[in-house]
Structures are given as structure tokens and as C-alpha cells.
Amino acid sequence: MVPFAGWEMPVQFSGLIQEHKAVRERLGMFDISHMGVLRLEGPDPKTALQQLVPSDLHRIGPGEASYTVLLNESGGIRDDLIVYDCGSIDAERGAVVVVINAACADSDTAWIRERMEPAGLTVTDLKNGGVLLALQGPEAIPLLEQLSGEDLSGLPRFGHRMVSISGLREPVFTARTGYTGEDGAELLLRAEDGQTLWTHLLDRGVTPCGLGARDTLRLEAAMHLYGQDMDSGTNPFEAGLGWLVHLEMPADFVGRPALEQTAASGPAKRLVGLKLQGRAIARHDYPVLHDGIRVGTVTSGTWSPTLEEAIALAYVPPALARPGKDLSVEIRGKAQPATVVRRPFYKRP
């Protein structure tokens, strides 16, 4: 167990490699109850929330979700999050659910409340008495269909619905989302139902997975970790998340002027994928070199159990961000050859 954002979290259960391969080949489950979950209710909650994110939330409808980011005034990323459109409550009110990172949960919640409550929205912390579980892997959806008796094949990526699972007291908020690069679902449910479901899944032989496998899986899929691969000093264009910025929409949002300027001038750095020669692993903050001169910094790195190669994410100048570019990473005082590659490193065939 290790401390993480005020929680005690398991690094591994049976072993990182075994857990990683279980998710890639079959199915693994994660307790992700450390994540923050907020429900916003009131008149037109998507329009109100739009002022905080650069992605056009009106592109999604009830039962759909959008990955996006919260920004500061300089266009830096406060956090990344998923916004779930939960549709209408009645003729005058709608609801959205947002899932935020554990390390940012307190500051995000205060910041969102400060801006949403004056707009007439009620902000409720759903973590009180609730848990989040993630089922990830090619067998995740078939297993949920067995447990619920429902056909989930039509639930699209980033789709969500309430699902009644056998043995649980209440229907479960079920979203086809995840942080592994595999198919799967994330479930929001009551604490007592969470314990029941976790125990039942263990009895069925589902592999429990810890933070170690969660990190190697997300890194193979080139999914960002907030605080490492992006932070308040990084804008979406630098982080390879420019596709989240919809400057064509008329709505104003925090950080828009700064992002308009960056879109016109180009980013000062770019996040790239690196594959390293040999077995040496690049870690956070290791220097990236070009012709022996430091030009960038590694943000995340690991040994890929799937590819059996050392991989990393790093920021480098735009001129050096082209796939195929030869660079090196300084590891324990020695320059290890590395090549810029396209992200993600792994994508399910």
C-alpha cells in the first residue's frame, strides 16, 4: 500500500505483470474510488459548465460523455475530466456528472462550486457513500451482460446508462470508459453494493489490479497522468490535446484568449512518445538530449509488458517532435538512444 492523494492505495495484488496481462488479454478490476465525482443539477447545466472547458459540450446529448480539461486564465490545464450528460430531471432542470482526478478533487470542487452555484446549479459530491469500480479488458462487457441480463453491445464508447446488476440493491451508473486502452466500463455505485460486487467478481476469478498495472496500461495507451504529463503550466496544444479545443464555437471559456494566441503562434513544446533502445527505463524528469544538449524532459516512462520495450512520454521542441527523430535520454549519467514514435504505443487491433 502507498499513500496517494490522501488515500492508501494498493500498488499490486498478484503482481504488476500478471495484472497488466489480465487486462490486455481477459479482464481486470480496479477500485478507483479515489477519483472525485460531482453531480451538477439546475437550469441548462452544460451551458453553465461550458464556461470552464474548451470542448463544445453541446456536441454530446443524454447518455453521452466528453473527455475534456479545466483551464486557468493562461490556458494551462487545471485538471482533465469526463463530463457525462445525464439529461433532463424535469421541464426546467438538467444534470451532468463530472469525474475529476483525486489529487485535484478538493481544489476542483471548490473552483467549480464557486462558478456554478451563482448560475443556479446545485453541486453534489457523489463520493459520499459511493464507490467507483472499473472493469477493463475484452471480457468486461460480456461479463456485465451476464450479471445484468442486459444487452450492452449497443452502448458506444463514452456512452452511459443505468444497469441493474443481479444481487445489488440499486441500478448502477455504468459508463463505457476507462484508463487502460481496452474496452470496459466504469461503475458508480453505493458503498455496500460496491463491496458486494467486488466480492462477487473475486469469486468469479476476476483479477484485482493495483496502481502499478493502472500506470503501465495507461502509459502504453499514451493516456495522460495529471501532474506528470500535464499541469497548470501546460496548455492543451502542447500536451497533444488540441483536439479538445473548439475555438470555432462562439462560447467564451476560461483561458480562451490565451489558447487563441497559442493556436495562432504554435506551441512552444510538444508531448511525444519515445521508444528507447535496451532495457533502461526513463523516469519522470529525466533529461532528453539532442546532440548531447538537453532539449526536453521525460514526463512518464516504463517497461511495456505488452510491447516488451522501454517507452516514455516527453516534452521536446516542435522541431524535434517528428516521428522517427533520433534523440536520447540521460539515465544514470549515460545517454540512452531513443526514437520519437507516434502515440499511442499500443492500440487494440
Residue ranges and their predicted role:
Residues 37-41, 59, 72, 83, ...:
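Short secondary-structure transition/capping motifs
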Residues 43-79, 140-170:
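Internal amphipathic helical hairpin motif
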Residues 58-62, 70-76, 82-92, 114-115, ...:
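Short, charge-rich binding segments
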Residues 1-3, 8-11, 17, 86-349:
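Conserved, structured C-terminal
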Residues 1-68, 76, 212:
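Acidic, proline/glycine-enriched N-terminal capping motif
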